[in-house]
Structure formats: C-alpha cells, structure tokens
C-alpha cells in the first residue's frame, strides 16, 4: 500500500548560487556524512538531484522539514547496480517507522536547467 508520495523540481541555478555563496557550508548543511564523502567536486547537477530527493522525501513523509526532520536525516546512496536509493535517519526514520514504511522508491533525473526526484513510500 502506498503511504506517501513526493515530487520535487529543483533549478540548477539556485543550487549553483548557493554553492557560490557557501561552497563548504551549503553541502554540509544538506548532505549526510556518507553523501559528503561521495560528492563529486563542483557537481551542481549531482547536488541538485540530492536536494530534490530530500525535498521529495520530506513531502512523502508528510512532514516537510518540520518536527525535527532535517536534510541530513535523509540519505541518498547507490546500490551496486547504480540504482539510487533513500535511507532515513533520526527524526525522518522515526516518522517513517510510525507510518509503517517498509519500502522506499526513488527516481532521479536532471537536465540542462533542472533536477527532479519522485519518492514513493510503501507499507
């Protein structure tokens, strides 16, 4: 059963501007430690796709970034096959547990000017 869905479209220019203003602080504020370690240098599209995934996940949880849920509580990682996946930590994990989330589906894409993500939470 579908418990939540979320969609986000992020402008690459917005992420580029944030990186130019705060090249160290911005990624540290939104990325989980494992994502920081995997972040390609100066990859706006990579970062924008993760930003979109986190926004979409927060929407699917129904919380947005309130109630203690933070960007760093939502981790995007890749399976060995290269498939992108989501993992919840902290308040996001607790909320997903309360909802009865058993499976998380994530789809990412990016083009010249935008990155997008869709998240489906299944129970």
UniProtKB/Swiss-Prot annotation:
EC number(s) per entry: 2.7.8.7
Subcellular locations according to the entry: Cytoplasm
Recorded catalytic activity of this chain's protein: apo-[ACP] + CoA = holo-[ACP] + adenosine 3',5'-bisphosphate + H(+)
Keyword Repressor found: no
UniProt-listed Pfam families: ACPS (PF01648)
One example of a Gene Ontology biological process annotation: fatty acid biosynthetic process
GO terms assigned for molecular function: holo-[acyl-carrier-protein] synthase activity; magnesium ion binding
Entry keyword annotation includes Lipid metabolism: yes
A cellular component annotation (GO) from this entry: cytoplasm
Required cofactor names: Mg(2+)
InterPro entries for this protein: 4-PPantetheinyl_Trfase_dom, 4-PPantetheinyl_Trfase_dom_sf, ACPS, Ppantetheine-prot_Trfase_dom
Keywords associated with the record: Cytoplasm, Fatty acid biosynthesis, Fatty acid metabolism, Lipid biosynthesis, Lipid metabolism, Magnesium, Metal-binding, Transferase
Residue numbers binding Mg(2+): 8, 55
Enzyme's top EC category: transferase
Protein family: Belongs to the P-Pant transferase superfamily. AcpS family.
Function: Transfers the 4'-phosphopantetheine moiety from coenzyme A to a Ser of acyl-carrier-protein.
Identification of the protein by name: Holo-[acyl-carrier-protein] synthase
